[in-house]
Amino acid sequence: MQWNVPRTVSRLARRTCLEPHNAGLFGRCQNVKGPLLLYNAESKAVLVQGSQKQWLHLSAAQCVAKERRPLDAHPPQPGVLRHKQGKQHVSFRRVFSSNATAQGTPEKKEEPDPLQDKSISLYQRFKKTFRQYGKVLIPVHLITSGVWFGTFYYAALKGVNVVPFLELIGLPDSVVSILKNSQSGNALTAYALFKIATPARYTVTLGGTSVTVKYLRSHGYMSTPPPVKEYLQDRMEETKELITEKMEETKDRLTEKLQETKEKVSFKKKVE
C-alpha cells in the first residue's frame, strides 16, 4: 500500500477545520481551489495539491491561494522570503532615520545686525561691528578716541586731581603711586583716564557707527546688506550658472572635435 502524502495532508486540514473547539484561536477559513501554498511565521512551506473545495483552519499561519501552474513551478524558498522581509525592514529603518534627521536639524537662524543686537556683551558687539562695518567703525573710533584723550589731557592741564577718584574706583596702589610720583604727570594721567573710560568709549563708538551707517545708507553711499539666506542663495545661483556655462562650452568643444575626427576618418576612407 503506497503512502499518498497530499491526500493525508488534505484529511488533516479538513479535520482541523471541522473541529474548531479544539483550537485555542479561530483563524480564517478559505475556500480555495487548486494548489495551496501554506507557510507560517517561521517560513516553512507546505504545498497541498487538490482540485476539490477544502476548508482550512489557519491560526498563526498565512494562506496564499494560487492557480494551477505547470509541474515545473516551485514554491518560493524560505531564504527568499526572509530576504524580502529583511529588505523591507532595512528600507523602513532608512526612511525613519532620514525623517528623524530632517526633524532633528533645525534651520539656522539669521544673525541680527550687531548694531541692534542687545543680547551680547559690549565687547562682542564691538568685534562683530568691526567685522561687518570695519570701514566705518575705524574712522569713528579714531575720532572719538582723539576727543576722549584730548578731553582728559585738558582736564589734567587745568589741575584736575584724579588720584582720589582712582583710589575710589579701587585701582591697585602700584598704579596710583606711579601717577602720584610721575614727572610727566598730565600725559600719564590722561592715558590712565582714557583706559578707565574704555566701556564708555566703546559705547560712544558703536553709537557713532550706527548713526554714520544710517546716514550713508539714506544717501546711497552704502547698500543695505541682504539677509544671510538670500545672500547664500544668490551666490549658489551664480555658481550654478558659471558651472552650466563651462559644461556647455566643454560639450561644444567635444562635439566639434568628434565631428572633425569623423570627417578625417571619412576622408581617409574615400582616399583609400
Curated annotation (Swiss-Prot):
The keyword Lyase does not apply. Pfam families: FAM210A-B_dom (PF06916). It is a single-pass membrane protein. Keywords: Coiled coil, Cytoplasm, Membrane, Mitochondrion, Transmembrane, Transmembrane helix. GO terms for cellular component: cytoplasm; membrane; mitochondrion. The chain crosses the membrane at residues 136-156. May play a role in the structure and strength of both muscle and bone. This is Protein FAM210A. It comes from Pongo abelii (Sumatran orangutan). The lineage of its organism: Eukaryota, Metazoa, Chordata, Craniata, Vertebrata. The gene is FAM210A.
